[in-house]
Amino acid sequence: MLHFVASVICLNQMESCDSVNVLSMEKKMESKLIVVAIGGNSLIEDPKHVSVDAQYEAARKTAAHIAHLIKEGHRVVIVHGNGPQVGFILLRAEYSSDILHPVPLDSCVADTQGAIGYQLQMALRNEMGKIGCQREVVTVVTQVEVSPNDPSFQKPTKPIGSFMTKEDAEKKVRDHGWAVVEDAGRGYRRVVPSPKPIDIVELETVRSLLEHGEIVIAAGGGGIPVRRDADGLLHGLEAVVDKDYAAALMAKRLNADMFVISTAVPEVCLNYGKPNQKQLSSMTLAEAAQYTAEGQFAPGSMLPKVNAMADFVKSTGNLGIITDPENLYDAVYHGRGTRMIL
């Protein structure tokens, strides 16, 4: 398991980007709070590049696009996925089960928050430095409260780990009792319980950091799933919270001006992967509901992204965008991606 110690941050000294060292009142008024959700698969470019070095390089490429948003003076909260990375930890635990103790899922999520948070922190600092921008970046180990009675504990749906062939998936079912599903036509993946988030334990910590000008990485992997008992004490649960739902909850509670989900495609598509595939530049809440009812969006893939975005837009009336990492800046400034509106 990975262990890390959070560094102590001096909150009374805020560094701002060199190019906007003294922000004018007009610029401050233009500054927006943007919550950006990054998929765990966005941090792994392909099955042949899964080493730690390769994951950092993928994180660097994504961070480069976010850095340009930060340089414009925006406040940013980053929520990252961890599906493949949690799968790697569980696979290591499986291979070493004869000599080491098992690793519960909540601890796996905590491990990935540290490891991926570290990669993103370093990448963001480096990429901001390249463009003359200096801001503090901090990762918050984040617990997310869920209900122990959530129906997902009886019916696992959340894909984690790497993609498998049908033969490999069937072997995991036979040998280890895994629940597996075919994921968006790209292969088979293990599925685990994915309860809906109902509260973010460290929300006020995130809010305080934002008020002091920090760039915050929080609720990584959807947050560490915990339940609260009758005495108000927290307990970890064997589950993985969907990072899109956790990010939407974060964006709502912070009243973010904009919620952006970064995924593998530049725009949401109808008839995805078919000859009549159609890209959407915009989508209303009514259209999102219609397309969902038609089965246009795959569960465990685009469906939770559309649902999470619709929840945010309906609750706040603010702008939601779904796009890929390469188009993050252009999505905010030049209308790229799929924009969800009321």
Where are these regions (language model features)?
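C-terminal catalytic "cap/lid" subdomain
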Residues: 26-342
